[in-house]
Amino acid sequence: MKHLLTVIFCMIVYITQINARLTFQTFDVKSGISDNYVIAMLRDQYGFMWFATLNGLNRYDGYQCKQYWVTDSDTYSNCFNNISEDASGTIWVRTPDQYFYYNRELDKLESNIEKRLRPLGINDKIEMIHVDYEQNLWCMTGNKLYYYDFQDKKLQELSFPDKELSHIVSRQSYSCLLFSNGEIAEVDWETKTVRKIVQLELPRSGEHRIYMDTQFRLWIYTIYTSNLQCYDIQNRKMFEFSGKETIQSDIVKAIIDDGNGNIWIGTNSKGIYILNEQADNLMHIHRDSGTPFSLSSNHINSFYKDNQDILWVGTTKQGVAFTDLNNTAFEICKTPEQEDISCFQEDRNGKLWLGFDGKGLACYDSKQINYKLFNTHNSNIPSNLIIGSYLCLLYTSDAADDGE
């Protein structure tokens, strides 16, 4: 009994520490996005955040949101179900009816996806597009599968069984297909074959999804059902995980691996469960109106982890919640000039630029721990009085500098 109480106490302390460590901020319609029902998210190679919602696609530049629609009359067609970016920088989005790509030059969504696919050697009418973890492109048409490797600039294709394909997942050397009948097959591009590895029993109705974590385990779930199963590819067996009954007491909507040994499982109404492999236990994160910076909603739609270790949570009612997985509260950057900082901006390389009220412009590189000051004496900036910045544009003043 004493041992049991000790275990329970340790679990409570661990869960409390996790909840205390994670602080969430919220981005919603009040912040500028078109709808609080957020279905998918993306941070592109330029640092813009994209939010696919029930009513419109949104791009956030750090200051404001811009909305994109494909029609002015049909709300259904403006529901964006998915968004991804391949290694070439092409952003692909999907509505209930069709696929679009984002034309950066014209700043609009284009429906003629053939324009981007033909140069890759893909000429068929495409029914499904998938971008994998290495940002390579997968396309499906009929019972034919295309795979384009951007690094090798190589297109491969193969035929798969005449079955309804529900989802594609690929990470490093493992590529798997989930069919609507519950069959999971592995793709071998060397032999150009598709071989069955396991047969699962799935609900007859609903959208079947598959997710591959960093340990190459497949998490299979069906939207709007409590069904959740896990299959270990490397060991070729089903994986039993802690808290399965607790998780399946609600509808599973999204799954993600945070890269730190935790599997995040988003539910329809009970918030987020975090399965920690090392501690072999289940943690629960939920909305707490009495706690500052808690999760904004228990109704989870989607997850997305960007390259800055920010985890984004799409909800059905409260927009987007996001948290820093590294829990870096503050980092001190000393400024020897000891002058008022009038503005600051982060560039696409992660460097922080500081504008001073009379001492010029400084650049701080947190990765290299390097600090450099630019002024009228050692650079070509027109003034030491920096009054603002916006979208990489610098604003100065010709007024007399107080510090000079």
What are these regions (language model features)?
Residues 1-398, 404:
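Carboxylate-rich, polar loop motifs that coordinate divalent cations or form catalytic acidic clusters
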